A protein has these predicted regions:
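Structured core elements
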Residues: 73, 84-86, 95, 111, ...
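Generic beta-strand/beta-sheet core signal
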Residues: 18, 75-77, 88, 111-113, ...
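Ferredoxin-type iron-sulfur electron-transfer modules in oxidoreductases and energy-metabolism complexes
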Residues: 134-147, 157, 161-221
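Active-site gating/interface segments in enzymes
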Residues: 21-25, 30-37, 101-151
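A glycine-rich, aromatic-flanked flexible loop/lid motif
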Residues: 64, 70-72, 120-134, 159-160, ...
Length: 221
């Protein structure tokens, strides 16, 4: 309601309320939800910006200011005082955690980003960058894969928002078949983690697909 009030009668602004659904914030999913049009694999889309990016563009254009600070959410069971903090870009992650009250002794991992697409940090001396939006402090170690072999149950295919075939992509990455990876549109994978989340064997699907994308890039050089 506040956004609608701020937009007023401006014909160039339309406020659309969408249901909370992961990963609806991704570019292609957002276009489908708002316009009803599906973006074909490999096709280009229009320019989409989140609120933070729009704010940064406004400051750059009207005030001549670069991105110098970020709002970072410190959260998770391992965080002593979960909170949002305004952080200077370049600040080491360990200093951000200390400022936010530190972490508990049982914290085993700090993830930069969210629980589904975040990346575990092996070194907390690395700096906050313009893409840093959250620090997730975890106390439970990730369960290891029960069996490295895919049982081809198909749950990953049902979960994939891009309509890909994770079970086949997993196999072709492991055998290095670039032709099949290209045919099955591996590059359309957004690494959302939905497939890994539902996998009963806890296979490292996202990590495998990242390696597969590197394999395809190397083949294009």
């Amino acid at each position: 309601e506040a956004l609608k009030a701020a937009a007023g009668d401006d014909e160039l602004v339309e406020i659309r309320v969408l249901p909370t659904r992961y990963p609806q914030g991704a570019k292609k999913q957002l276009i489908l939800a708002v316009t009803g049009k599906e973006v074909a694999p490999g096709a280009r889309t229009g320019a989409l910006f989140n609120v933070t990016t729009v704010y940064s563009i406004c400051r750059a254009v009207y005030e001549g200011l670069p991105i110098t600070e970020k709002v970072v959410t410190v959260t998770g069971e391992g965080a002593n005082e979960p909170k949002n903090v305004i952080v200077r870009v370049g600040t080491p992650i360990e200093q951000v955690l200390d400022f936010a009250g530190g972490v508990k002794e049982e914290t085993c991992k700090v993830v930069c980003g969210g629980p589904m697409m975040g990346v575990a940090q092996g070194n907390l001396a690395v700096p906050v960058v313009k893409g840093t939006n959250a620090l997730l402090c975890l106390t439970d170690p990730a369960p290891a894969a029960e069996d490295p072999a895919c049982i081809r149950c198909g749950k990953c295919m049902d979960a994939c928002p891009m309509g890909l075939q994770p079970l086949n992509l997993y196999r072709y990455v492991n055998c290095g078949d670039k032709e099949e990876l290209g045919r099955l549109n591996l590059e359309d994978c957004m690494e959302c983690g939905c497939c890994a989340y539902v996998c009963p064997g806890r296979l490292p699907l996202v990590e495998t697909f990242k390696a597969g994308k590197k394999l395809l890039k190397e083949g294009k050089r």
